[in-house]
Amino acid sequence: VLTSTLARVKGDDGGTIDTKRSQRRRALGRSRGGLTTKLHLITEARGLPMRLHVTGGNVVDCSAFEAVMAGRRLARIGPGRPRTRPDRLIADKDYSSRKIRTYLRRRGIQAVIPERRDQLANRRRKGGRGGRPYAFDAEAYKERNLVERCFGKLKQWRAIATRFDKLASRYLAGATIGCLMLWLRQLEMSDTL
């Protein structure tokens, strides 16, 4: 399950010259609300975080897709090396693009991504030349709430909900510690059962 969330940046006077390059390196993006950072997250089937990626708040979600998908590994049941391809990927409309769907199709991953309204209108406007509608499993899409609940648990930590760190690497480290805490809490709960 894949999605992203914004974190508002507080207290960033920077202390350095604020160039576009330094903003990209520090994962800062300027929008109407000021400086923001976007945290992209992939969770596994139980809603536990697997892969984090940080970008500026003004970066489009689909442009960070390949970076988010790059480093994840899924443990196998029994012996064998970890899998690099999940059975399916559930994502929101922000990740609905031809490039992402092609990426997933080539790797044999089922895409459970709703079609955006403008894509649907363009396909219908073209008629028979617009192609077939994308397959969409509405029942499987209901599992997307797992990643939203994971973000809710992560944002209980003040440093993740509101970014105070100057460097993106420190913010990512704090978010990673939050993810580790979620995994440890899950292990602790499974040991008591």
List where the protein language model places each region.
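Short, catalytically relevant binding-site loops at active-site mouths
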Residues: A7-R8, G56-V60, R72-R73, D94-R98, ...
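Short glycine-rich loop/turn motifs
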Residues: T36-H40
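Active-site beta-loop-alpha junctions of metal-dependent nucleic acid enzymes
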Residues: H53-P79
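Generic alpha-helical structural context detector
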Residues: A67-A70, G152, C179-L182
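Helix-centered, glycine/charged polyanion-binding patches within enzymatic domains
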Residues: I77-L167
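Charged phosphate-binding loop/patch that engages nucleotide di/tri-phosphates or the phosphate backbone
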Residues: G174-L193
